[in-house]
């Protein structure tokens, strides 16, 4: 009589499921929208005008030199005296400040041309430009106001403290100073427009 095999057959091996594939990487964020073409063109035009006005203002102030023969108390003869911008610290500050504004306008004009050729200008870059424009506006406005105050005293005098007006003697010098201050005021207005333009562009991007 044969023996019965009581051993149970081994169960078939369990099929292991393959691990699921890793999820696909998220798509890259879309590039920032380029500034409108009108913005870039207007920005370049304003910065070129700013450069021209800053340079013109400095040149007119530096060339404001006039020599006159004036009467000095206690001296029997007329004395030659030269009026120039170096005689006033306010005018020296004016020339230095507008020179900085002119140098800044050169740099930012070149940057604006680059933004036109590569319109993917980031919002951070426009924000930095707006901040620097505000700083240059403060510099130009303070220099214009300081020089304007001194020029007004030279034109009208101040009877309360005994300051005599000098523009009746140094007429050419005063015309140069007045023209330079007027051009600097125009440069300040251009900087205001540049700040508004940058802020409007930032607002348009944030709204989107």
From Swiss-Prot:
Keywords: Cell membrane, Membrane, Transmembrane, Transmembrane helix. It is a multi-pass membrane protein. It comes from the Eukaryota. SUPFAM superfamilies: Formin homology 2 domain (FH2 domain) (SSF101447). Pfam families: CASP_dom. The keyword Transmembrane helix applies. GO terms for cellular component: plasma membrane. Residues 1-41, 111-133, 202-208 are cytoplasmic. The keyword rRNA-binding does not apply. The chain crosses the membrane at residues 42-62, 90-110, 134-154, 181-201. Residues 63-89, 155-180 are extracellular. Residues 1-36 are annotated as: Disordered. Homodimer and heterodimers. Belongs to the Casparian strip membrane proteins (CASP) family. This is CASP-like protein 1D1. It comes from Vitis vinifera. The lineage of its organism: Eukaryota, Viridiplantae, Streptophyta, Embryophyta, Tracheophyta.
């Amino acid at each position: 009589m044969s023996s019965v095999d009581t051993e149970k057959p081994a169960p078939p091996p369990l099929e292991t499921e393959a691990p699921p594939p890793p999820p696909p990487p998220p798509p890259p964020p879309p590039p920032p929208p380029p500034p409108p073409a009108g913005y870039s063109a207007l920005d370049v035009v304003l910065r070129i005008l700013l450069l021209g006005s800053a340079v013109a203002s400095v040149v007119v102030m530096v060339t404001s030199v006039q020599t006159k023969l004036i009467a000095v108390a206690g001296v029997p003869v007329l004395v030659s005296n030269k009026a120039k911008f170096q005689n006033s610290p306010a005018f020296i500050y004016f020339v230095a400040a507008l020179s900085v504004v002119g140098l800044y306008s050169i740099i930012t004009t070149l940057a604006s041309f680059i933004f036109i050729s590569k319109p993917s200008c980031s919002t951070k870059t426009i924000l930095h430009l707006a901040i620097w424009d505000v700083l240059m506006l403060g510099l130009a406005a303070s220099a214009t106001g300081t020089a304007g105050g001194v020029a007004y005293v030279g034109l009208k005098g101040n009877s309360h403290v005994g300051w005599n007006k000098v523009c009746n003697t140094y007429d050419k010098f005063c015309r140069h100073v007045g023209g330079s201050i007027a051009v600097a005021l125009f440069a300040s207005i251009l900087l205001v427009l540049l700040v508004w333009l940058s802020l409007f562009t930032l607002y348009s991007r944030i709204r989107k």
